[in-house]
Each structure stands twice: as structure tokens, then as C-alpha cells.
UniProtKB/Swiss-Prot annotation:
Positions bearing N6-(pyridoxal phosphate)lysine: K94
Protein's name according to its UniProt entry: Tryptophan synthase beta chain
InterPro entries: Trp_synth_b_CS, Trp_synth_beta, Trp_synth_beta/beta-like, TrpB-like_PALP, TrpB-like_PALP_sf
EC number in record: 4.2.1.20
Molecular functions per Gene Ontology: tryptophan synthase activity
Subunit structure: Tetramer of two alpha and two beta chains.
Reactions this protein catalyses: (1S,2R)-1-C-(indol-3-yl)glycerol 3-phosphate + L-serine = D-glyceraldehyde 3-phosphate + L-tryptophan + H2O
Length: 404
């Protein structure tokens, strides 16, 4: 394994050619303040202790690493272990980062938070920590996502957040990020931008990765305990890339195959997909340089996925870099493949995963049978499917997939 991999951003916030701080001058003081505060917090054992306390006592970590016996047997290949991020308080991996950033904001003396959300999971996690630490929160959410995720909108409001519908563009996650950044520019003195994925201007990709890498650290110690060795392959779904980078990061320098699974939507050959790596090219969006779905003229294209959490047109800078150097292999799953995997997995394991996570499972179903029974795959179940019940119900009804 190549030990020359760059695992931290350079002084200018780049991983290879990706990353940076493409923001208006008015935001630079806030970015500089955040970078300094984060560096201090990271080095402060007291901050780390407080974070660990809340992760354990409030979130319920460590999450289990569960051997999927029935699923493994049905696929007839590698042993499959599930990293159960669906068992966190609020039902997904998003809380790991929301909690860390809220503690950081509190340390910086910020009384208010602003966040964007797609599926609503990051919004719910942000509203949860805002309630916990008595902070105000404004959440920007695309109007299209609000329609898809009514239950999460109500959750956020019940928790005390103000949810603002974004009608611009496609009314999805990308548009919500634009609005959240604009809001932050004009409320920068008392507000922290609680960015939910491993993207945005430096230091956000690093901050989000560090708070999410608790996933990979736990996997490492748990699999060593259970199997006495590291896994052969690790699989995670990828939108902006926070659950995947958190899963992969502690294994970057190990001899472990890493697979990120993008959303192919209605198919690679259509224009309705979210394949930033698969069909995209490097460009700048939301303050960072990364792989983007864009046309020849550099216009960012609309992303599509049945999963509200994966329909983002970019993929974070660290993932973009790992793709270029060949450290992470990017695969994809279409809406249909993901939904079929979700239904199959649920029947075998009695666990209903989020549609996002089902994209990773779809690739596991292709990968596992090609491996031997001694091989080990770990797949991150990034969230639970409660929020997706209506989408799953509609999908099955439209296709006459009776629940027999």
C-alpha cells in the first residue's frame, strides 16, 4: 500500500488539486476563525473528552458491527458485516458530525446555527443538537425534498428549528447549500454554519471527516476483535461523501479495498443520475474544487436519485483526490438496483436500511459472490429506512411488488 498518500489538506486546504476556499471575501474572516478554533479544539483533550461523553451517553456509540449471517449465506461468498449507523440516536450517521460541530460552535461563542439538508437527516441531527445545547437553528431545505420528507420536516420543527423552503433551481440539496452559505455570509458574527457533508470550503471537509471517522475507527477495533484481522473490502454509499469518508479514512493506509457507491438514478446513459465521479469532471461549487456533474461549458447539472440524500451534483474534495490516485474505487447503483437490494436485505436481516445505504448493499450483492467464504466485507448502513417508508411503499405499489 502506498504510504505517500496525502491524508491531510495542505496549507491552502487542498487534497491534491481538490478543495480550497472558493468563497467571497466577506466570508474569509469566518473561515479563518473556524480553522483556528478547530485546530485548537482538536488539540484540546478536554474538547475530545466532552465529544466522547456525548457520543457515548447521548448518541449511543459505539454502534455494533453485526455479522449478517442470512444475507451472507444468500449471496454465497464473502462474510458480510454491517456497521450499524442506523442505530445512532436520530437514525443515521449525521449526528456524529452535528454533535461535534455544535460543541465547536459553542466553544467559539456562537449562539445560532444554520444548516442545509436533503433527506432531512442532517436537519434532524442539527435540530437535535440545537435543542440539546439551547441554540437557535435555521434549516434550508429544497421544496422538492420537503415534499419527499414531510416527516423529517415536522421532526425538525418539533425540535425547535425553523425550516425554510428553497424554491430555487431544482429545489433540492444543492440549492439548499447555496441558501445556507448566503445566510451565513450575512449572519456570520453570531452564527456557525453546520455543514452536513464532507465538502464546502476548507476546513469543512476536514472537520466533517474527522467527526465522522469515529465510524471507521470503531470498525477497525471491532473487526480485529471479531476476526483478528482487517476486512478485505469496505463498502459505503456516496452523495457528498461524509459517511463514506468517515468509514474509509482510518483504513486509507491499510491494505483494504475501499468502494464508494454513487447513485446512478435512472441509469448511467440517462441525464437523471448523481454520478459526480462516474460521469463528472473537476469544477468548483459551494466553495470547493471537486468532481461535479457539469456540461462542457461548466454549468452544474441537476442530479437525480430516488434517495434524497444522494442527489447532490458533487463529491467532496478528499474523495475526488482518492479517486484520482486510485485509492478508492467508485461504483454505482441505479434506483432500481438500490430498491431491489433494500427489499432483499430487509427480508434476510430484519433491518430496513435507508435508501442511501441500499445503494451500498446493491454493490455488496454484486461483490460478495465474486469473493471466497474466507473473505470479509464491511458495509456501512448509514441510516435507517423510517424516513423512506412512503417512497418504498409507492415504489412497490407502482411495480406490483406485493409484500408477500
Amino acid at each position: 500500500m502506498n504510504k505517500q498518500i496525502q491524508t491531510e489538506a495542505d496549507e491552502l486546504g487542498f487534497f491534491g488539486e481538490y478543495g480550497g476556499q472558493y468563497v467571497p471575501e466577506t466570508l474569509m474572516p469566518a473561515i479563518i476563525e473556524l480553522k483556528k478554533a478547530y485546530k485548537e479544539a482538536k488539540a484540546d483533550p478536554e474538547f475530545q473528552r466532552e465529544l466522547e461523553y456525548y457520543l457515548s451517553e447521548y448518541v449511543g456509540r459505539a454502534t455494533p458491527l453485526t455479522y449478517a449471517a442470512s444475507y451472507t449465506e444468500s449471496l454465497g461468498g464473502a462474510k458480510i458485516y454491517l456497521k450499524r449507523e442506523d442505530l445512532n440516536h436520530t437514525g443515521a450517521h449525521k449526528i456524529n458530525n452535528a454533535l461535534g460541530q455544535a460543541l465547536l460552535a459553542k466553544r467559539m461563542g456562537k449562539k445560532k446555527l444554520v444548516a442545509e439538508t436533503g433527506a432531512g437527516q442532517h436537519g434532524v441531527a442539527s435540530a437535535t443538537v440545537a435543542a440539546l445545547f439551547d441554540m437557535e437553528l435555521v434549516v434550508f431545505m429544497g421544496s422538492e425534498d420537503i415534499k419527499r420528507q414531510q416527516l423529517n420536516v415536522f421532526r425538525m420543527e418539533l425540535l425547535g428549528a425553523k425550516v425554510v423552503a428553497v424554491e430555487d433551481g431544482q429545489g433540492t440539496l444543492s440549492d439548499a447549500v447555496n441558501k445556507a452559505l448566503q445566510y451565513w455570509v450575512s449572519h456570520v458574527d453570531d452564527t456557525h454554519y453546520l455543514l452536513g457533508s464532507a465538502l464546502g470550503p476548507d476546513p469543512f471537509p476536514t472537520i466533517v471527516r474527522d467527526f465522522q471517522s469515529v465510524i471507521g475507527k470503531e470498525i477497525k477495533s471491532q473487526i480485529l476483535k471479531k476476526e483478528g484481522r482487517l476486512p478485505d473490502a469496505i463498502v459505503a454509499c456516496i452523495g457528498g461523501g461524509s459517511n463514506a469518508i468517515g468509514t474509509f479514512y482510518p483504513f486509507i493506509k491499510d491494505d483494504v479495498a475501499l468502494y464508494g457507491v454513487e447513485a446512478a438514478g435512472q441509469g448511467e446513459d440517462t441525464d437523471k443520475h448523481a454520478l459526480a465521479i462516474g460521469k463528472g469532471s473537476p469544477g468548483v461549487l459551494h466553495g470547493t474544487k471537486m468532481y461535479l456533474i457539469q456540461d462542457e461549458g461548466g454549468q452544474v447539472q441537476l442530479a437525480h436519485s430516488i434517495s434524497a440524500g444522494l442527489d447532490y451534483p458533487g463529491i467532496g474534495p478528499e474523495h475526488s483526490y482518492y479517486h484520482d490516485i486510485g485509492r478508492v474505487t467508485f461504483e454505482n447503483a441505479s434506483d432500481t438496483q438500490a430498491m431491489n437490494a433494500l427489499i432483499n436485505f430487509t427480508k434476510h436481516e430484519g433491518i430496513i436500511p435507508a435508501i442511501e445505504s441500499a445503494h451500498a448493499l446493491s454493490y455488496v450483492e454484486r461483490l460478495a459472490p465474486t469473493m471466497s467464504k474466507e473473505d470479509i466485507i464491511v458495509v456501512t448502513i448509514s441510516g435507517r429506512g423510517d424516513k423512506d417508508m412512503e417512497t418504498i411503499r409507492q415504489y412497490m405499489a407502482e411495480r406490483g411488488l406485493a409484500n408477500d
